[in-house]
Amino acid sequence: GRPDVKGRKEILEVHAKNKPIGDDVDLQQIAQITAGFTGADLENLLNEAAILAAKQNQAYITQNEINQAMIKVGIGKEKKSKIISEKEKRITAYHESGHAILFHVLPDVGPVHTVSVIPTGAGAAGYTMPLPAKDEMFLTKGKMLQDIMVSLGGRIAEELILDDITTGASQDIKQATAAAKAMVTKYGFSEKLGLINYDDDSDDVFIGRDLAHSKAYGESTASAIDEEVRRIVEDCY
């Protein structure tokens, strides 16, 4: 499994031994805010920070390089060379602001670490990156609903400010749908479907259709699952 905070600090200490770490870098703090990072992620984090420091002819790795490396490892490399219009920048800024505002106001998500309108190598026009969550053994229903709300925040901002919508929310919608699907089929969070595990480990967004196709459940149950997934997402919106 992925290391806990103690394990992450130990991994960071191993990979920091041969690197010039500045006085402002606190490995314990880095360990606390990198929940979900694997050992390889942590190694990459320090390696990327070292490369960034070297490019700037710095004698030591500072917290600034650590922050930049966290973004690269967690989100993907920014494509600063990609030319985007002022209109696209403005749309992206509104979209990402929608995510950031919900990270700020909802109690069980966030806080925000970075908001950017610089495109990433993964194809996103921008990104909003929260501080990684603390190590948790489980998720609550309320936390999952708030995660869905945050995912939909960009689309909401587009509607409210632009009076139009864009394709920029496609990955957000996919994440929201996947979370709602898990709530219904895996975690028993739907009163309508009850405490039954309908999870088939499929990535198919239209879970009901997939279940009906596999003959695992009847058409009525498959339709009920789709309806519940849709209801959860729409209620969060």
PLM feature spans:
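Catalytic donor/gating beta->alpha subdomain of glycosyltransferases that bind UDP-sugars
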Residues: 49, 61-64, 68, 136-146
